[in-house]
Amino acid sequence: MNREERLRAVLSGKEPDRVPVSVWMHLSQYDQDPRSLAEAMVEFNEKYDYDFIKMMPFGAYTTSDWGTKLEIFCDKYKEVEIAAPAISSLEDYKRI
């Protein structure tokens, strides 16, 4: 089976030739730019030939939708930091 056949078998309740496999890791030097992250993840997957890709954006990416202020560095050795949380008081819950 190729990776697509393997995943389709699992999703349809059939037994694959083996368990689909993937690994993931945070790619801090790319994860703050969607295009760079997608390209890096595809390259990573092609290099190791896993069955599927799990995207790994930086951990706080969804919090900015609620008003969290993030400090973004685009640095291989420095991850995104929360500069100001969306909620710092009970009153903030009414706002969001």
Residue ranges and their predicted role:
Residues 1-96:
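Catalytic cores of TIM-barrel enzymes
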